[in-house]
């Protein structure tokens, strides 16, 4: 089956709506569903589904895992936007979760999604073997936890107004931050997609390298867009990282050098695809869209 970005987005949106039904106590499920179903690019579930398809698996088998990863992503956004974290009022052009439901419910909705997501994997992955499901859950807990996106969030908080002059030390911190805060969910998406397709270890390592590189490129692009875009284009408050003295690619390297680094990262992604003979119009489309939006 040939799928494009819009096909994937429609599929994921329909399933996300199906997987989270409003039940008692309604406020928690409404809060969970609010952020999960906000309009978005759905890159992480798309990359899970497309990796599975690209490596010979069935898209249908990967849908629960792909949607679980989007729920995990939504959880990170809810908590990231909280006043005690980044204190953002808007996400994707809409009020952030705590602005709609209050801080207490937002915290609990994030916690709920963190545990709700793996339940989706175990409940709806009937076509996968128990061993495959255990492998997928292990990947989920690894990238979701204290050695994954949480580690990235901690370093992000601690990077505010860093009193470090050494450029190499700053680069090391910046890379660690973005590998864990951003790349880890892309790695989770592609690694689980490969596992569902029953790919061998070499293919899993190849998609891991692609995902890690793409995640860094995505974060550089995000930093660039924060500098050159408007609220209407991004749907969120701009310039907050700079105001708060956070470490970003643009604050460390400047706009033009950041664009050069982005171009190199995207070229490396294409090299990995070519070397492995991976064929994917969707991945090419994603890379080209980033180039277009950032003007490189």
Model-predicted regions and their roles:
Residues 1-296:
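All-alpha prenyltransferase/terpene-synthase fold signal
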């Amino acid at each position: 089956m040939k799928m494009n970005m819009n096909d994937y987005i429609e599929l994921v949106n329909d399933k996300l709506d199906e997987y989270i039904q409003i039940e008692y106590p309604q406020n928690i499920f409404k809060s969970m569903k609010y952020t999960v179903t906000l309009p978005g690019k759905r890159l992480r579930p798309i990359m899970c589904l497309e990796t599975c398809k690209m490596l010979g698996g069935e898209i249908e088998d990967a849908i629960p895992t792909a949607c679980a990863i989007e729920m995990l992503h939504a959880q990170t956004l809810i908590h990231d936007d909280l006043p005690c974290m980044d204190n953002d009022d808007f996400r994707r052009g809409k009020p952030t979760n705590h602005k709609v439901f209050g801080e207490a419910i937002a915290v609990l909705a994030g916690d709920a999604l963190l545990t709700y997501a793996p339940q989706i994997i175990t409940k709806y992955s009937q076509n996968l073997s128990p061993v495959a499901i255990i492998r997928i859950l292990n990947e989920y807990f690894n990238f979701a936890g204290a050695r994954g996106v949480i580690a990235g969030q901690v370093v992000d908080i601690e990077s505010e107004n860093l009193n470090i002059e050494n450029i190499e030390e700053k680069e090391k911190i910046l890379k660690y931050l973005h590998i864990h805060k951003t790349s880890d969910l892309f790695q989770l998406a592609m690694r689980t997609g490969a596992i569902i397709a029953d790919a061998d270890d070499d293919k899993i390592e190849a998609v891991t390298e692609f995902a890690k590189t793409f995640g860094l490129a995505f974060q550089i692009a995000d930093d660039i867009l924060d500098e050159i875009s408007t609220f209407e284009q991004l749907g969120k408050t701009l310039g907050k990282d700079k105001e708060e003295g956070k470490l970003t690619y643009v604050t460390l390297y400047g706009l033009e050098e950041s664009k050069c680094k982005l171009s190199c990262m995207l070229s490396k992604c294409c090299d990995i695809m070519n070397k492995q003979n991976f064929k994917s119009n969707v991945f090419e489309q994603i890379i080209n869209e980033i180039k277009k939006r950032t003007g490189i």
